[in-house]
Swiss-Prot record:
Gene3D superfamilies named in the record: Ribonuclease E inhibitor RraA/RraA-like
InterPro entries recorded: RraA (IPR010203), RraA/RraA-like (IPR005493), RraA/RraA-like_sf (IPR036704)
Binding site for a divalent metal cation: D99
GO biological process, one term: regulation of RNA metabolic process
Any one GO MF annotation of this record: ribonuclease inhibitor activity
Protein known as: Putative 4-hydroxy-4-methyl-2-oxoglutarate aldolase
Chemical reaction(s) catalysed: 4-hydroxy-4-methyl-2-oxoglutarate = 2 pyruvate; oxaloacetate + H(+) = pyruvate + CO2
Record's keyword terms, sorted: Lyase, Metal-binding
Cofactor note (record): Divalent metal cation.
Assembly, per entry: Homotrimer.
SUPFAM superfamilies in alphabetical order: RraA-like
Known function: Catalyzes the aldol cleavage of 4-hydroxy-4-methyl-2-oxoglutarate (HMG) into 2 molecules of pyruvate. Also contains a secondary oxaloacetate (OAA) decarboxylase activity due to the common pyruvate enolate transition state formed following C-C bond cleavage in the retro-aldol and decarboxylation reactions.
Keyword Metal-binding belongs to the record: yes
Length: 163
């Protein structure tokens, strides 16, 4: 597992990276993560999140535009454990998570806005691999996202940690 330091990436690639507004917190068991972006756009319905974490996620980060909802959790312990089992590097969730005491022990990166104990509805509503924009940054499927306890950033191409 590669360790990323976002300040070092910003220093090494200042013209390449876009930094998200500082509203995310680390809820996962990994201090840092990065990989190729897979996007979901949904609102208080995590059906597509469930579908995606059941697939092979090696080298990928699931970016979930949950509309910034603070009323439901788009990720909990069971889905985080599936994501870890299937090799996902991490998830960036513009929304809430729950089961935070288990998430912090799960080998997957999780950046989200807050915790909330209420689960979502499962209506099968949402869009997969569409361009999404939140926190002042646009996420395009196939681009790259990197996160640590300092922040989250996006790059159009893969980045290497400076030596």
């Amino acid at each position: 597992m590669q360790h990323y330091v976002t300040p070092d990436l910003c220093d090494a690639y200042p013209d390449l990276v876009q930094v998200l507004e500082p509203m995310f917190s680390n809820f996962g068991g990994r201090d840092s993560f990065g990989g190729q972006i897979v996007t979901i756009k949904c609102f208080e319905d995590n059906s597509l999140v469930k579908e995606q974490v059941e697939l092979d996620g090696k080298g990928k980060v699931l970016v979930v535009d949950g509309g910034g909802s603070l009323r439901r959790a788009l990720l909990g312990d069971m889905l985080a454990e599936k994501a870890a089992k299937n090799g996902w590097e991490g998830l960036v969730i513009y929304g809430c998570v729950r089961d935070v005491d288990v998430l912090i022990q799960t080998d997957v990166g999780v950046q989200a806005l807050a915790s909330h104990p209420m689960k979502t509805d499962k209506r099968g509503i949402g869009d997969l691999n569409v361009v999404v924009t939140f926190a002042g940054v646009t996420f395009r499927p196939g681009e790259y996202v990197y996160a640590d306890n300092n922040g989250v950033l996006v790059s159009p191409s893969p980045l290497k940690m400076p030596e």
